[in-house]
């Protein structure tokens, strides 16, 4: 790393090689393994191998101890789990028997130990036998309890059928969850196998790393590098000496190239070893973290906190739902019992009330028959009274007609009376007829004619009045006979009505007594109805509360179902993401492997190129030394013309390097370093003519 940061030679005075090149010659690393004896080397190598094997044994022992401790914890957990399961089964069976205690059926519980006596069996057959016996006992007790439940339960209600359908649906969902659990278990087994393979690869890599970190192996590698570089260098020296007849400069150049390559390789090895050590430390820390991960580390993670919060919320909801479910079940049972008792009481009261009402209805039917008969009699009486009124109205009309006939008769009699009075006066005054004269006779005739006319005029009125009187008299006679008959009939009916009246009075007294008793019964029934209404209102309030609680439970159940569906969707998404991530991890691992292979190839190329660069640097240093020597020689033996030519060949900007780069725009010559500096500093104008140029306008003249 320090060689890369070494400053370049910028002047002719700095011709001495760096101090590090003098200090590092690479001879000690090559000569140390040659001084070691064979026995000591073998002993040191065996000690290193034994030490590495002991380290491997210690790692295996630590892993085995951690696994043993984990297995011990799991075995204790499984033992406690089996004990808890056994106690739970016994508690469930005891609770089922307590539920059947009200029916009066007693069951003989077999004498069993209060815990599992064969949890830690070593023999699998005995443990299987123990489990089969335990399962048979639990099945027998459960079948007996369920048979008693079925016999005592009777017909299945629709609620029970709905619950059984819900249980069937939940069992189907449970089977689906079991299938998912099996799939996740298989995936877990596959991941555990992959983890075991990765740990095996890790152990192998750690073993190789320990072997690479061993001092003996490093010495062997250094010796191999020295042996690989030495013959080539010696061969080159021999050939070069053969060709140049013992040219020591070229041998020294080759030697320095070999030493530079060896030092560069040593530096690369140091870098690789440092990287390997850092990776090993990181691997050991990661392994320690993986092995020493505690529950607190998991508790501190955000995923665990989120899962814990969700789990606590679900547990709280489940506890509240269980408590409310238990409370509602107890309240429903109590209400069912009250409902049955209330129904029996209502049926008894209704039967009693119906019997009383039927008896009252019979009495009311009898009363209705009596009332209808009384109504018929009253209707008959009213019709008779109407007929009587009609007859009286007709008699009144007849009386009126008789009065009119009487008036006619009175007028006729008045006219007759007046006529008779006149005739009497005339008779009293009139003399003898024979003594009368013609005039007197004529007068008398006219008078008689007048009387005759008046009599003729009176006769129709008299006849009419006579006819009317005759008719009225006949009618009166007939009416009188009819009234006599009606009077006899009415007298008989009056006697009958008196008898009916006394019977109706008796019936009215009995009805009044019945009405009093019915009113008393009605007051009692109204009190009972008021009590029933109060109970019905209370039941309605309870039903309303229960319906509200049921709606709340349905809503909570719906929210839980939606959350469950969301959790299923999220779990499916997580599974899909894990699958996609696993695919991505596999793709990335393949890509990383390919990239690692490519990087290894590139690294090898870089190593070879770095060694070549070191060799070229050594050659460059020798060339610079030769140049400086020739420069000094030339300066010591140069003339003014040579000095002028030399200054003309030097760059006009730095006066240090020779002109080797020309600008196409103007044709002036400068050194490539100055031109590159001006391009990088954005001073892209010729210092001689100030013409602009670009990177494409630069042209090398010679090398």
UniProtKB/Swiss-Prot annotation:
Coiled-coil region list: 49-75, 170-459, 512-569, 603-635
Region (Disordered): 1-35, 213-246
Catalytic activity: S-ubiquitinyl-[E2 ubiquitin-conjugating enzyme]-L-cysteine + [acceptor protein]-L-lysine = [E2 ubiquitin-conjugating enzyme]-L-cysteine + N(6)-ubiquitinyl-[acceptor protein]-L-lysine
ZnF RING-type span: 651-690
Domain of life of the organism encoding this protein: Eukaryota
GO CC terms: HULC complex; nucleus
GO biological process terms, semicolon-separated: chromatin organization; protein ubiquitination
Name of the top EC class for this enzyme: transferase
Predominant place of localization: nucleus
Keywords recorded for this protein, A-Z: Chromatin regulator, Coiled coil, Metal-binding, Nucleus, Transferase, Ubl conjugation pathway, Zinc, Zinc-finger
Compartments reported by the entry: Nucleus
EC number of this enzyme: 2.3.2.27
SMART domains noted in UniProt: RING
Nucleus is among the record's keywords: yes
Pathway(s) this gene product operates in, as recorded in its UniProt entry: Protein modification; protein ubiquitination
The UniProt record lists the keyword Transferase: yes
Comp. bias intervals (Polar residues): 214-246
GO molecular function: ubiquitin protein ligase activity; zinc ion binding
Function noted in UniProt: E3 ubiquitin-protein ligase that mediates monoubiquitination of histone H2B to form H2BK123ub1. H2BK123ub1 gives a specific tag for epigenetic transcriptional activation and is also a prerequisite for H3K4me and H3K79me formation.
Family of this protein: Belongs to the BRE1 family.
Protein name, entry field: E3 ubiquitin-protein ligase BRE1
Gene this chain is encoded by: BRE1
């Amino acid at each position: 790393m320090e060689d890369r940061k070494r400053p370049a030679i910028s002047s002719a005075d700095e011709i001495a090689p760096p101090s590090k090149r003098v200090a590092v010659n690479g001879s000690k690393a090559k000569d140390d393994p040659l001084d070691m004896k064979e026995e000591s080397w073998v002993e040191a190598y065996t000690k290193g191998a034994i030490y590495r094997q002991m380290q491997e044994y210690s790692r295996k022992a630590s892993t085995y101890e951690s696994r043993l401790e984990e297995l011990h914890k799991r075995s204790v957990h499984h033992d406690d789990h089996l004990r808890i399961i056994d106690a739970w089964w016994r508690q469930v069976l005891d609770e089922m028997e307590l539920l059947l205690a009200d029916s009066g059926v007693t069951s003989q519980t077999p004498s069993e130990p209060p815990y599992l006596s064969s949890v830690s069996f070593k023999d699998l057959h005995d443990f299987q036998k123990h489990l089969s016996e335990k399962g048979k006992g639990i099945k027998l007790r459960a079948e007996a309890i369920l048979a008693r439940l079925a016999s005592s339960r009777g017909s299945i209600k629709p609620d029970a059928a709905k619950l059984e359908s819900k249980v069937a649906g939940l069992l189907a969902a449970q089977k689906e969850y079991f299938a998912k659990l099996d799939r996740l278990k298989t995936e877990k087994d596959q991941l555990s196998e992959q983890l075991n393979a990765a740990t095996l690869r890790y152990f192998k890599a750690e073993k190789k790393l320990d072997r690479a970190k061993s001092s003996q192996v490093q010495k062997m590698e250094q010796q191999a590098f020295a042996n690989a570089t030495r013959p080539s260098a010696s061969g080159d020296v021999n050939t070069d000496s053969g060709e140049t007849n013992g040219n020591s400069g070229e041998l020294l150049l080759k030697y320095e190239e070999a030493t530079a390559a060896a030092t560069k390789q040593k530096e690369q090895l140091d870098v690789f070893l440092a990287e390997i050590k850092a990776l090993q430390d990181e691997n050991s820390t990661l392994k320690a973290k993986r092995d020493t991960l505690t529950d607190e580390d998991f508790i501190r993670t955000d995923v665990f906190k989120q899962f814990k919060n969700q789990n606590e919320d679900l547990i709280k909801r489940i506890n509240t739902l269980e408590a409310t479910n238990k409370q509602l079940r107890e309240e429903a049972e109590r209400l069912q019992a009250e409902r049955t008792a209330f129904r029996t009481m209502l049926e008894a009261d209704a039967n009693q009330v119906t019997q009383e009402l039927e008896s009252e209805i019979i009495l009311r039917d009898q009363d209705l028959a009596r009332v209808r008969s009384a109504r018929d009699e009253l209707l008959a009486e009213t019709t008779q009274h109407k007929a009587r009124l009609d007859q009286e109205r007709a008699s009144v009309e007849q009386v009126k007609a008789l009065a009119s006939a009487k008036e006619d008769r009175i007028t006729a009699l008045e006219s007759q009376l007046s006529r008779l009075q006149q005739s009497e006066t005339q008779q009293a005054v009139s003399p003898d007829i024979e003594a009368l004269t013609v005039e007197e006779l004529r007068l008398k005739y006219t008078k008689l004619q007048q009387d005759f006319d008046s009599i003729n005029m009176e006769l129709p009125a008299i006849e009419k009045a006579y006819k009317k009187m005759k008719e009225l008299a006949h009618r009166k006679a007939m009416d009188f006979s009819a009234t006599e008959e009606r009077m006899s009939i009415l007298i008989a009916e009056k006697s009958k009505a008196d008898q009916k009246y006394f019977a109706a009075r008796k019936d009215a007294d009995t009805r009044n007594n019945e009405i009093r008793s019915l009113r008393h019964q009605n007051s009692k029934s109204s009190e009972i109805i008021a009590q029933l209404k109060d109970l019905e209102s209370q039941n309605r309030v309870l039903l309303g509360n229960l319906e509200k609680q049921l709606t709340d439970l349905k809503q909570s159940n719906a929210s839980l179902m939606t959350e469950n569906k969301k959790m299923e969707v999220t779990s499916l998404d997580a599974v899909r993401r894990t699958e996609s991530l696993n695919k991505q991890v596999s793709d990335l691992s393949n890509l990383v492997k390919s990239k690692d292979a490519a990087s290894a190839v590139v690294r090898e190329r870089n190593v070879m190129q770095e060694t070549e660069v070191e060799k070229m640097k050594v050659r460059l240093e020798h060339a610079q030394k030769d140049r400086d020597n020739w420069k000094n020689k030339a300066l010591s033996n140069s003339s003014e013309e040579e000095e002028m030519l030399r200054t003309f060949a030097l760059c006009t900007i730095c006066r240090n390097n020779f002109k080797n780069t020309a600008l196409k725009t103007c044709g002036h010559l400068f050194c490539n370093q100055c031109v590159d500096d001006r391009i990088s500093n954005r001073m892209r104008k010729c210092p001689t003519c100030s013409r602009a140029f670009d990177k494409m306008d630069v042209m090398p003249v010679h090398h």
